[in-house]
Amino acid sequence: MASNPINTMDRFTSFPQEIQAIEALRKTRRSKIKKYPTVSVLLSTLRADDLSNVLDQLLAQTLVTFDLVLGLHTIELSASHKRQIAALNRRKVKVVIQKFTKDQTLGTILSTLASQSSGKYIAKMDDDDYYGPEHLRDLVDAALDTGAEVVGRAMNYVYLEPLQLTVRRFAPHGTQAVELWSDWVCGGTILAQRDVAEAAGWFGDGNTAVDRFMLSGVTNNGGKIWRTFGAGYIYRRTFTFHTYVTNYSKYLNGANEQVVGIWDHPIFGGER
């Protein structure tokens, strides 16, 4: 049964109050865990700079043991990337690398990476988002506590890159609601039991809606999805050839708070 100190929070909850509730929840959940299961991180990338950033974030993760299945979509590893991977290896993080051509879809890439994974859980991470050091461990904590087949984060923090603003969106409803059963979580935070994800067809073979493919497949098979708090993850919105053009007003109008730049707090990894 899940432990829920956060479920009494509402849109008037301050950031310090949110952090306090999260820390209490972590303490409760981790006091019950004797051993962590194996986790395979799935990462598809086609941007060298973003790969550098996410490799640094993986190196900072507090989850003691995990491995990385890395898909290079039309790019090559630089000397700097290789040094980062060597640092992961020294941390006993096994890194499996596969190259993919331009014509291969995102769904095909992620499904291929998932099929090569060995962990009891798979964790999808996106190269253009921001992850705090407790990210993976928080997700596993929630999975073990709730028994959910899939766990992921709410969309509470969004970085609007063209505006250089991070907005905090917190409400007891919609995509901002936390610590509850749901049919949706942020795609860049999906943690799923490997066998359940495989039965759902992994991420399909399309170029879009790959996260929804997985989540729908899980629920259609009778699996349950738990959405935990968003703090510790920042979803990045920008204008590029591979992301949707977004009306930023929906994020600004729904914001409880906003800060210039990327939110600077240890839960997000500190200053970037």
Residue ranges and their predicted role:
Residues V158-Y159, T228-P266:
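Active-site donor/metal-binding and catalytic loop motifs
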Residues H73, M125-D127:
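Active-site acidic Asp-centered loop
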Residues S115, M125, E134-G204:
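Conserved catalytic core of nucleotide-sugar-dependent glycosyltransferases
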Residues T208-M214:
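Acidic donor-binding loop at a coil-to-helix junction in glycosyltransferase catalytic cores
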Residues I122:
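Short aromatic/hydrophobic "clamp" motif used to bind/position activated sugar donors
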Residues F100-S117:
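Glycine-rich, basic loop-to-helix element that forms the pyrophosphate-binding segment
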Residues M1-A60:
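N-proximal low-complexity "stem/linker" segments adjacent to membrane-targeting elements
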Residues Q57-K99:
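Acidic donor-binding segment of Leloir-type glycosyltransferases
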